[in-house]
Amino acid sequence: MKVLVDTNVILDVLCNRKEFVADSLRVFQCCEAQRITGYISALSIPNIVYIMRKELDTEKIREILHTLTMVFSVVELRESDLLKAAELPFDDYEDAIQSVCATRVRADYIVTRNEKDFVNSPVQAISPTGLLKQF
């Protein structure tokens, strides 16, 4: 199974968001163990760094980036992705980019806590909890 993991799920783990960390961490671990083929979009990386920069030093951020690129394949952004995303019926351009990336890698799901934001995505959105129920 191939999944594109949305930025919020990664941040649940990195920020230890009590309400969400358990299932998000299990998804992360399934990708790490290669039980699931995990992808993140290149867009997620600068967003993660931007959010984490206030709490972590540069070295720790480098370690996190190294770990992320070991666990997940990073889907590069192409000019055509940006243009396709702009044409999709999404309220949020970043979500549209995630959808385009998921489509390009033929992901089975977009793993996100914001399923409602992806109702117009050709790739079905699923919560971490929903994904884990399939195992």
Predicted regions, residues:
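Acidic, PIN/NYN-like endoribonuclease modules and their adjacent C-terminal/linker elements
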Residues: 2, 71, 103-135
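Active-site-proximal, substrate-binding regions of enzyme catalytic domains
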Residues: 25, 45-73, 80-81
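Short, well-structured N-terminal submotif of metal-dependent ribonuclease cores
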Residues: 1-40, 53-60, 120, 135
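N-terminal alpha-helical segment
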Residues: 3, 41-45, 78
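A generic structural signal for short hydrophobic patches within well-formed alpha-helices
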Residues: 10, 45, 82, 118, ...
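Alpha-helix boundary recognition
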Residues: 29-32, 66-70, 86, 103, ...
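General small-molecule cofactor/ligand-binding pocket signal
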Residues: 39, 75, 126
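Active-site neighborhoods of divalent-metal-dependent phosphate/nucleic-acid chemistry enzymes
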Residues: 73-115
